[in-house]
Amino acid sequence: MALRLVEELTNEGIIKTERVKKAMLAVPREEFVMPEYRMMAYEDRPLPLFFDATISAPHMVAMMCELVEPRPGMKILEVGTGSGYQAAVCAEAIERKGKVYTIEIVKELAIYAAQNIERLGYWGIVEVYHGDGKKGLERHAPFDAIIVTAAARTIPSELIKQLKDGGVLVIPIEEGVGQVLYKITKRGEKIEKRAITYVLFVPLRDS
């Protein structure tokens, strides 16, 4: 089932690189969904977790992962851990060589994600934190890439500060009645914004 889904995403041009393709095949999505949704794990759709959180649709996980151009040795920050699935995919995409830090504002979700990450052997490559992701994770900055899995009203300035020069922020931003996914590249004191597509994410929560 995973292979069929990944082949579909590859044929649709969402998965572009062999690295992301291998990562999507390596991570068992059924281990990151609630038990009652395991049979739906390889449908290309978001699925409910708890506390109004969701696990993103596979196409969105793959797209965001491709946008940060993963490579071995990268240091990635994820804002909005959810169940830990995106963090695990990122860990595989950097070939488990580097570090993925992920921060979740809902304590119960952070605990759930940490349990998933540890059970599946990603602990040490992935570190899970409980806190306000809009503030980033300054103690581990700067980052090569930051992925935000919830929609912000504006680009959080702290996240830009915590990017390396040339680093990439992938984030959905609320615009009018919708949301737009942006790839933002830091160039010295300036940023380059590129709109990718319209999306639908849960809102980025305040602490």
UniProtKB/Swiss-Prot annotation:
One of its GO terms (molecular function) is protein-L-isoaspartate (D-aspartate) O-methyltransferase activity. InterPro entries: PCMT (IPR000682), SAM-dependent_MTases_sf (IPR029063). CDD domains: AdoMet_MTases. Its EC number is 2.1.1.77. One of its GO terms (biological process) is protein repair. Keywords: Cytoplasm, Methyltransferase, S-adenosyl-L-methionine, Transferase. The keyword Transferase applies. It catalyses: [protein]-L-isoaspartate + S-adenosyl-L-methionine = [protein]-L-isoaspartate alpha-methyl ester + S-adenosyl-L-homocysteine. It holds the Pfam family PCMT. Its main location: cytoplasm. It is found in: Cytoplasm. The active site is at residue 56. Belongs to the methyltransferase superfamily. L-isoaspartyl/D-aspartyl protein methyltransferase family. Catalyzes the methyl esterification of L-isoaspartyl residues in peptides and proteins that result from spontaneous decomposition of normal L-aspartyl and L-asparaginyl residues. It plays a role in the repair and/or degradation of damaged proteins. NCBIfam families: pimt (TIGR00080), PRK00312.1 (NF001453). This is Protein-L-isoaspartate O-methyltransferase. It comes from Pyrobaculum islandicum (strain DSM 4184 / JCM 9189 / GEO3). The gene is pcm.
